[in-house]
């Protein structure tokens, strides 16, 4: 056999053994992304989606009206599918060391990250924005109101069937034993002081002042639970100061201790603030008009397990997420963004009523966020209140 044939056969072996498998692997990894881009491009071409990359000037933004939250069942939001992706994932940063950070009582750290006395900078735009109803492969409607955004490999048909099932626990609204736990893995997340069309970039959007961070939103939830007679615990430990790293490890330890002491608790709600920002730095303030007032729109996150996350009962959390979503939409039309069902953990293995709730974003005012806390509390009180 001459050297030319030998070389050709060697090249053929290399192509079959290495190049083709590598190409197939790379295509498999990218196929979903290419498909999604193609779907979006087709949607743009057909007028289904309207990208919102070109921004108006600050003066135009100041006079821009809030999109009405009164959406009919058949109305599709005019916002871009890209905008739905702008909300970043909650960072579940593990502890750097093997030692879990110790949470700190809120009263001990009140002045550690003070809320700014004034914000004179005007170097960023805040745009009000209302998430509506969406069409597309990832979305399906709930019978009771609201939507789910399915970012998993499970089919929408399967999840729709599950969404109609009742939640898998019972709340004793007449019991003196706590039934609900409200806590905040990222308690220092904060908001704008007032309803504004600009922000000061020197403000970190974090504070240990409990009147201006997530603790105040939790307080509003709990005030309504009080009125409904539902026993609860509001854990005000600060898990993300002095270090953000390991905050989920810290809150997990605290929640487990509370559940051991109070096994009557069925529902654990980790209440956060989102951070939605365009590439040009514009911050979005998701809002809905509820009974003549602006409320920060909320998003429920329900985690799915791909078999590696230790959450065998994740579907029971999903049942509760759908029930709560529909109850909120029934009570306060337009308050919710679609439930995010995705491969997330967020300590949702600890009960079968564990959810994460994002209230507004860093473009919202503290008043808008606190009002949403009040509305969440009213709905929970209606769902679980006793006679």
Residue map of PLM features:
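Solvent-exposed loop/turn segments at secondary-structure junctions
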Residues: 187-190, 238-242, 273-278, 305-308, ...
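Active-site-adjacent mobile loop/cap segments within catalytic or ligand-binding domains
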Residues: 336-387
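N-terminal Sec-pathway targeting helices
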Residues: 1-15
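A short, glycine/acidic-enriched catalytic loop
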Residues: 200-204, 276-312
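Alpha-helical scaffolding within the catalytic cores
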Residues: 252-255, 280-288, 339-345
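Soluble periplasmic/extracytoplasmic beta-strand elements of cell-envelope proteins
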Residues: 179-184, 233, 267-272, 299-301, ...
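Active-site-adjacent substrate-binding region
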Residues: 313-340
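N-terminal catalytic or cofactor-binding beta/alpha core of small enzyme domains
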Residues: 13-264, 275-280, 374, 382-387
């Amino acid at each position: 056999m001459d050297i030319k044939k030998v070389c050709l056969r060697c090249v053929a072996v290399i192509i079959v053994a290495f190049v083709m498998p590598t190409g197939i692997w790379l295509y498999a990894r990218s196929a979903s992304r290419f498909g999604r881009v193609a779907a979006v491009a087709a949607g743009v071409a057909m007028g289904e989606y309207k990208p919102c990359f070109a921004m108006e000037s600050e003066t135009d933004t100041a006079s821009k009206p809030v999109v009405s939250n009164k959406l009919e069942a058949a109305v599709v939001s005019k916002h871009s599918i890209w905008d739905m992706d702008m909300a970043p994932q909650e960072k579940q940063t593990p502890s750097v060391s093997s030692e879990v950070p110790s949470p700190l009582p809120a009263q001990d750290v009140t002045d550690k990250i003070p809320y700014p006395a004034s914000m004179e900078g005007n170097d960023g735009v805040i745009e009000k924005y209302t998430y509506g109803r969406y069409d597309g492969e990832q979305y399906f409607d709930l019978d009771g109101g609201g939507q789910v955004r399915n970012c998993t490999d499970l089919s929408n048909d399967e999840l729709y069937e599950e969404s109609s099932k009742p939640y898998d626990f019972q709340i004793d609204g007449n019991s003196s034993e706590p039934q609900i736990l409200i806590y905040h893995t990222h308690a220092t997340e904060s908001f704008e002081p007032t309803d504004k069309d600009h922000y000061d970039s020197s403000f970190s959007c974090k504070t240990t002042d409990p009147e201006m961070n997530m603790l105040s939103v939790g307080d509003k939830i709990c005030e309504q639970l009080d009125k409904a007679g539902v026993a609860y615990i509001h854990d005000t430990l600060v898990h993300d100061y002095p270090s953000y790293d390991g905050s989920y490890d810290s809150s997990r330890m605290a929640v487990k201790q509370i559940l051991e002491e109070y096994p009557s608790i069925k529902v654990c709600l980790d209440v956060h603030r989102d951070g939605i920002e365009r590439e040009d730095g514009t911050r979005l303030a998701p809002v809905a008009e509820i009974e003549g007032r602006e409320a920060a729109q909320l998003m429920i996150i329900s985690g799915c397990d791909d078999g590696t996350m230790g959450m065998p009962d994740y579907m029971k959390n999903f049942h509760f997420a759908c029930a709560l979503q529909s109850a909120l939409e029934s009570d306060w039309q337009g308050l919710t963004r679609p439930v995010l069902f995705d491969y997330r953990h967020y300590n949702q293995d600890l009960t079968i009523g564990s959810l994460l709730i994002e209230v507004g974003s860093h473009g919202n005012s503290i008043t808008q966020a606190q009002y949403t806390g009040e509305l969440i509390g009213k709905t929970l009180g209606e769902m679980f209140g006793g006679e």
